Each structure stands twice: as structure tokens, then as C-alpha cells.
Amino acid sequence: MEPGRGGVETVGKFEFSRKDLIGHGAFAVVFKGRHREKHDLEVAVKCINKKNLAKSQTLLGKEIKILKELKHENIVALYDFQEMANSVYLVMEYCNGGDLADYLHTMRTLSEDTVRLFLQQIAGAMRLLHSKGIIHRDLKPQNILLSNPGGRRANPSNIRVKIADFGFARYLQSNMMAATLCGSPMYMAPEVIMSQHYDGKADLWSIGTIVYQCLTGKAPFQASSPQDLRLFYEKNKTLVPAIPRETSAPLRQLLLALLQRNHKDRMDFDEFFHHPFLDASTPIKKSPPVPVPSYPSSGSGSSSSSSSASHLASPPSLGEMPQLQKTLTSPADAAGFLQGSRDSGGSSKDSCDTDDFVMVPAQFPGDLVAEAASAKPPPDSLLCSGSSLVASAGLESHGRTPSPSPTCSSSPSPSGRPGPFSSNRYGASVPIPVPTQVHNYQRIEQNLQSPTQQQTARSSAIRRSGSTTPLGFGRASPSPPSHTDGAMLARKLSLGGGRPYTPSPQVGTIPERPSWSRVPSPQGADVRVGRSPRPGSSVPEHSPRTTGLGCRLHSAPNLSDFHVVRPKLPKPPTDPLGATFSPPQTSAPQPCPGLQSCRPLRGSPKLPDFLQRSPLPPILGSPTKAGPSFDFPKTPSSQNLLTLLARQGVVMTPPRNRTLPDLSEASPFHGQQLGSGLRPAEDTRGPFGRSFSTSRITDLLLKAAFGTQASDSGSTDSLQEKPMEIAPSAGFGGTLHPGARGGGASSPAPVVFTVGSPPSGATPPQSTRTRMFSVGSSSSLGSTGSSSARHLVPGACGEAPELSAPGHCCSLADPLAANLEGAVTFEAPDLPEETLMEQEHTETLHSLRFTLAFAQQVLEIAALKGSASEAAGGPEYQLQESVVADQISQLSREWGFAEQLVLYLKVAELLSSGLQTAIDQIRAGKLCLSSTVKQVVRRLNELYKASVVSCQGLSLRLQRFFLDKQRLLDGIHGVTAERLILSHAVQMVQSAALDEMFQHREGCVPRYHKALLLLEGLQHTLTDQADIENIAKCKLCIERRLSALLSGVYA
């Protein structure tokens, strides 16, 4: 390898920069490079440190030569190999789709046809390896890479699967190999984990576990540690994986044959290569694969299964909507579109286009529109089988009420299209608006008479963005459409998507008409929910899931997904269409009261635009004429909050797209405190009350989103028409975000996401115990969130944000860069390795950490003693001491060194004991070599070495002192480390109490904590029971004082 210019390094005919880091593991680092002449040829350069390799370098070279000869489309190609003094460089094929582990993390599960596509390619690579006698022995999703020739949004059928990282594990040192096993024990065969003799069938077991995870989302046999998994395999002679019932027979038989504990009973390679499931002509259960999700750094994709909750995806943005719209000219065309979607499975279109839609099963009736018009639910609900057809089949004629006996004479035509509606039987009556909505009703009438709205018929087939899109069917209204509103009917048949009119996924908060059948909830609230059956599963006639139009949710979660079912709100006659959604059944969260199922918040991808609960949905891209009754300025950083407010019954209409600096022009508060903030729901008489489960959003969240914005200057409504006042609360300090104070181009106001649940009961509106994640530019107050520690600034008023400790970053994309539909990504923090470790490992690590903290405090005391000794050696001090008759005081410098030596000896003893404990626990297998353990042990070792060096230096410095001053040795025996530590702790408590008495409380709490830590350490080292009891009493007093002090600060 030769260093190039600008930090570019060369490996043979290839070059790379260490800035382009792709990934790293326990033994190697991978960089992205390219060919020096053919720049379009991208490669991956893996750098392996020779310290991680065993002595058999010649065998590694032979193995690499063999791998260079393996030319297969499903094996990562090895282009070049260079061995340097300290490292080995492997130049391999670059795969732009990431690995299968990331793919499954995004999609959770794959359909059987996608599993077969991937498995056929894996089998092709294994056929070549098996013919050459090569055993992989480490097959796992992380070692299966994906390549997308067609780009990031390639169809799953176009994804190329490639096996990587085989043959190298055998040359790793034994202890390093043990660390690797901690990462992937679930995919290793039982004979490998139990250290028995194994052959090539071990790879077949790994393939079985990978297929099982692709199908169900988890490994077939799991344990908290490799030791537990080994014990599980040793105790259970027969293993039977839990295969879902709806799995096809060929795939079930394949899994059972691959996942045999005894390798003799396991199928061989010939049976595997010729298995019926791998045969493309074998009829299996079809499920359309979901398009490939967009990764930040790769373009791999997946397919979604109908058996589990899919990963969160984003709805289409406003920029994508014009490409997704389909124009309908009549109700018959609208119904025909539904029929066409159902029958389009046999079309000869491109696979990318057909796979973007889900084919409605043939058993669904074709006269959906006719039955919807008669105010009856369809006999069989449109349940999407795991993918995302979006059809809003609800019909409603705004401003018209049905006659006492509404009937609709329509019969489906032979082509499946319904006949025309006899809408002349229905009498039309003009609804009387409430007094506060007179102006809005006049605007509504103007919109109804607008020629552009009467002549424009819209319908859009929603394409899935990422993996899926929020799906739902609008429910039918008892009001049939009039014969003059054919265009409006086509609009109401629009298959809703990312427009403001499309409802977002939420269960149990939509008021219902009396004509709809309902599912009783445990609390008595009426909830219409349903779950999509697997393809081929039958739905009984009496099943509750057939009573509502349902679908699987693949969209981003709203902040109110965990709301308790609220009482039904009275709906005016002009209320827009509602929609019911069927959330996926997940096993992780406990069901909320009143909900059939609820989904945990998994971050926040792009949220759909907020609901516009005006009587008419606006035309996409046209200005809105209807005036809002509650006029909230729409900022890019508050889209998700507007969704929540609209869902809770607040009528909102965006006047126009405005940014925060525009709003600041109409804001009379330029950093001043304003009135009472948000009024309670009972004062406003509006449906803005908090439900019992709104722990994900507090009143502080609403203040942060809307508090810094005054009423929109472009609105013609007066303040008297707005019964709700949005202003920053005086209890929160009344201060604005720095970006909101300036009149220039500044960042939008921060949106505060509360993480975790508040205490039981109602959360105070002025609560400051929240964690702030700023949505917006980098100038937001708190853009870094910590998953472990939260620190509140003591003594600060409400304007001081909560400072999160350094940790994992919850990065939220800038909404300005993505317009109003910008992707809001939540990067979940990685779980610490100790999460799945055994209790003995956790307890030992806690003990090591405590030893390290205690030793550091003792070293601070030793440093203070050393500084006092240095000061005593100064000329001024010696001049003053020359007149003192006491000889011991003349030797104060040496005395300080003696105290320092005793403390360093104590530290060395503690650290030596901790290191020995770690070694014993590691040898016993109770302490795993995780990165945290390595870091703590490394720090313990460093401090131990430093303490030993300090002891040696001090002993040399005091050697003459001990020889000349023999009489002082008797006094030195009375100096013990425990006595010095106790004395220092008492002094710290006394000084803190003295400062507290004089109202200097800034540094009291840290000193109390340090003293408490020192006393805790003494309690572990002392042997005299009386001393231990005295220390316990001192600790109790300090803890009481700390409790009183903290309650006074945070009150």
C-alpha cells in the first residue's frame, strides 16, 4: 500500500480514502474505494490487523488464492489482496444495498416469494462452495450482502444476494473467536456451539435460521447469552421451531428439515438444492413484494409479510403526488378503478409498477360503491393482506341530508361496475350552521359553487413510499351523492395519500354514524378495528374484523397512537369523511385500554400532512378559500403536532405556507412574557382535553410548537372567533427560541418530544421535566438526546432546557430542506451490550465500576496531599517554619509525602483486587468481554500502573526521611488510608454545610455526593462492626440532607 495525495491510499490498482468508512467489526475496518483508472468501478477495501490473525499466515494466503478463483454472481468477488507489514488488505466487490440484517431490521419480515428469490441465490452460491469443499461456518444476515443494479428503489426480484466473509474465521485466535461468537450464536448450528465435530451441514442449519427469521422476524431459538443457548441445546434433544400456521407446506417442510438438532437427521445438500420450495414452478402462496426501502447509505429493499408489523415507512411527499394521481370522470370509472386494481395482477406491465400496488382478492364484491351509497357496510371488508392498497371508498354529499327512507337502485354490471345512482329520489335540505361558524359556512358555499371544484375530478392511486404507505378506506356516509356532483364523487373516491385530507393511523378516535356496526371495547367505547388476514386465510361472516374497512398500517406513527378511546364527539352534518384503520398485531406492547392493539413508537419517520377537517377537502396545489375556525399558522416543524390536534377535533385549515420569520412580523411579543398560555379544555368548551394516555405529548409540547407564533396576519378572522389562545406560558419563562426572535431567515421553532411516561394522573401544564429533541436547524437548544442520563440545571427558571448527557444522538432532519413533507428520521440509539448479559456479568461490571470510581476519588485526595506538600516546600513556608520549635512541623513536607504514599498503596491494593476479580470472572465464564468491560478493565489497569509508579517514586523520595527520622515511624503507623479518607469526607460535608448556611448552594450537592461515595467505599473496606455502623449513620444523615436539598431546588 502506498500513501497517495490528499489522504488517498493505494492498494494495487485500487485506491481509497480512510474518510470513506463503510463499516467496522471486531477484526477489520472496511473503506469504500474505486479503481484508479476506471473510476466508476467501486470497491470495498477491508483492512485486517495482523494482531487479530493467528500465526498461520501461509494458510491464509492459500485460502485467499482459492477465494479469488471463486467466480459466482452470488459470492462477493475478491479483486485483489495485499499483505503489508502490519495489515492485510482485501479489495472486494462493493454492494450498494447493505446487508440482510439491515434489510430485515427495516422490513421485519419478508413474504414467501421474496424469501424464495433470496434463497435461490443463496443456494446457487452454496452449490459452488459445496463443490469445492468450502464450509462457511459463519452464515448470518450480516454476512449476506445485497446489491441493487437498478438503484436504490430496485424491485426485490432485481436484488442480487451475495455471500461474504467466509473462510477467514478459522484463522482468528481462539479468544478473539469467542468474542465473535457473542455476536451471532443464534445462527450457528448446535454442534458448533457445543464444540462437537461438524461438517458442511452446519451451514444448512444457519440457512434455516436465516429463512426462519426472514419469515417471522426472529430467530427460531434464542437465549440471553451463548452459554444459555448452549445449555438449551444440550438439554433439549429434539427441537421443533414454531412455524406460523399460514406458512405454505413446501416452506414448512424445508424449515423442519433444515432445523434438525442432530446433523445426521438434517437434510443434505442435494436435497436442499432440489427442494420443491426452490423450484420456481412450484405453486406457493403469493404475496406481492414491497419495494425496496431507501437507506441513507444503501439502496437495499425488502418485501413485507402479512403476519407481523412492518417497519415504519414514509408516505409519499407532495413532490411525488402529481406522479401518483389517476383521473376519474364518473362514479362508474371510480368503481372500475377499484375493479381494475383487483384484476391487474395478470397484467403484463413492468414488475416495478405492478408491485407498487396490492391486488384486492377476488372474493371482494364489485358493487362496493353501490352498497356504500346505501349506507350499509360492505359484506366483506376490504382487508389488505399485508401490503398497501389505499382506497377511500366512502361517499358523502356535503350539505345534503338523506330523506327518511333512502334507497338506492343499482345493480352491478357484468363487468363488475355498479350501475348509476338514482340520486333524484333524495331531497336536499340546507343545513343551518351554528352562530360561530356563519362566516366559515359562507366560504364553504362559495367553494361548493366554485367552477374549478365542480369540474375537477380527482383520484390518486397511492404508491408506496419506502416500504408502505398509510392505508385506509373512508367509510360511507348515509348521504348519497347527487346526480350533479359526479365530479365531487370522484374526488371522494380518491385513494387518499399524503394530502392534508388523508386521515392518519389512529384507532378509536373517529366518531361514527349510527348505521355502522361496531365492535364493543372493554370500556364500552365503540371501536372499529380489524386485522388483515394472511393470504389464503378465511374470514368468518361473524368476525368482528369484517365490520369495518381495515388495512394494515405501514405508515409512520402519530404521537397519539396510544390514546385511550375517547367518547364519540357530536358530528355536524358537514363533517368530512372518517376512516378506520387496523393496526398490526404486535406482541411487544401491552394493549391499551379500549384498543384492540397498539403499536410502540419506533421513532418518527415522515409523518403525513395534518388532517384538514373542513367540509370540503382542498384541491392539492390550489389555495384554500375556506376560513378556519381555529387558525394555526403552519410551520414545517409542527406537522406532526397539527396531525394530533386535527385528530382530537380541532378544525384547522392552513392559510398558506409560512415560515417562522414571516410569523414573527405579526408577533407583538419579541422576547416578552405573555399571558396564561393554553387554556384548559373545560374553559374553551372545545374537544382539546387530554386523554389518559397522552404521555407522549404534554402541554409543554404544544407551547413549544405554537407558543412562539401569533395569529397569522394573512387571516381575516378576528380573535373573537378563536376560542383557544395559543401563547407561551409565563411559567415557562415566556422566552422564545433564539431562531424565533430574529426577523431574518432563522430556524423554525423547536418541537419538544417527551420521552417516557409521566407519573400517573394529569401532567402539570408547566412541567419542565421533559427531554427536548429539537426538530429544525442545528441552532436548536437541545439537539442531542441521551438514553441514560438526564440533568436539570439547578436554580434555573423554566427557560433553562434540560441538558442531556453526552450519548446517542437523536438526529432529526431539517424540515426546510424537504419542504413541508420532509423526512423526519429518528435514529434509535444502540442498545448496550450488557442488555442481554447474565446477572452475574452485570453485577461484576457494577462492582468494577464502583471500584474505579472509588479509586479515582482516593487519587484526588492523594493529589491534594501532594499539592500541600509542594506548598510546604516553598521558601516562604520554610522561612516561617524556621522559627517554630516543633520538629515535626518542620518535616511537614515529608509527612505529606508519607500520607500520599499510604493513599497510593491503598489505591494499588484496591485496583489489584478489582483486576484479579475481573480475571477470575472472565476465566469462569461469568464476565463476558464486552466493549464496556474492556474499557473499565483498561482504565483499572492504567490507574494501577500509575499508582505503582507513584509509590515507587515516593518511596525513593522518603527513603532518606525514614532512615534519618526513625522516631517518626511510630507516628506513621497511626496514619491509615481509611482514617485519611474519613477525615476528608467529614471535611467535605462540613464545608458543604457551611456554604449551605450562607446560601451558597451551587457546589453543595456535588460535595455531598463525593462524600457519600467515599463513605460507601469505606463501608466496604472496614472490618470493625462499630466503624461500619458509624459510617452507615453518617451516610443516612448525608442522604437525608441531600433529599431535602434536592426537593428544595426542584420544587
Curated annotation (Swiss-Prot):
The active site is at D138. The keyword Ligase does not apply. ATP binds at I22, G23, H24, G25, A26, F27, A28, V29, V30, K46. This is Serine/threonine-protein kinase ULK1. The gene is Ulk1. Residues 283-323, 335-358, 394-554, 661-686, 727-787 are annotated as: Disordered. Changing S811A: Does not affect phosphorylation by AMPK in vitro. Belongs to the protein kinase superfamily. Ser/Thr protein kinase family. APG1/unc-51/ULK1 subfamily. Autophosphorylated. Phosphorylated under nutrient-rich conditions; dephosphorylated during starvation or following treatment with rapamycin. In response to nutrient limitation, phosphorylated and activated by AMPK, leading to activate autophagy. Under nutrient sufficiency, phosphorylated by MTOR/mTOR, disrupting the interaction with AMPK and preventing activation of ULK1. Acetylation by KAT5/TIP60 stimulates the protein kinase activity. The protein kinase activity is activated by unanchored 'Lys-63'-linked polyubiquitin chains: unanchored 'Lys-63'-linked polyubiquitin chains are catalyzed by TRIM32 in an AMBRA1-dependent manner. SUPFAM superfamilies: Protein kinase-like (PK-like). Residues 829-1051 are annotated as: C-terminal domain. The modification Phosphoserine is found at S317, S403, S450, S467, S477, S479, S521, S555, S637, S638, S757, S774, S777. It catalyses: L-seryl-[protein] + ATP = O-phospho-L-seryl-[protein] + ADP + H(+); L-threonyl-[protein] + ATP = O-phospho-L-threonyl-[protein] + ADP + H(+). One of its GO terms (molecular function) is ATP binding. Residues 16-278 form the Protein kinase domain. GO terms for cellular component: Atg1/ULK1 kinase complex; autophagosome; cytoplasm; cytoplasmic vesicle membrane; cytosol; membrane; neuron projection; neuronal cell body. The lineage of its organism: Eukaryota, Metazoa, Chordata, Craniata, Vertebrata. Residues 295-318, 340-349, 400-423, 774-787 have a biased composition (Low complexity). It is found in: Cytoplasm, Cytosol; Preautophagosomal structure. Keywords: Acetylation, ATP-binding, Autophagy, Cytoplasm, Kinase, Nucleotide-binding, Phosphoprotein, Serine/threonine-protein kinase, Transferase, Ubl conjugation. Residues 731-745 have a biased composition (Gly residues). Its main location: cytoplasm. Serine/threonine-protein kinase involved in autophagy in response to starvation. Acts upstream of phosphatidylinositol 3-kinase PIK3C3 to regulate the formation of autophagophores, the precursors of autophagosomes. Part of regulatory feedback loops in autophagy: acts both as a downstream effector and negative regulator of mammalian target of rapamycin complex 1 (mTORC1) via interaction with RPTOR. Activated via phosphorylation by AMPK and also acts as a regulator of AMPK by mediating phosphorylation of AMPK subunits PRKAA1, PRKAB2 and PRKAG1, leading to negatively regulate AMPK activity. Residues 287-416 are annotated as: Interaction with GABARAP and GABARAPL2. The modification Phosphothreonine is found at T456, T574, T635. The keyword Iron does not apply. Its EC number is 2.7.11.1.
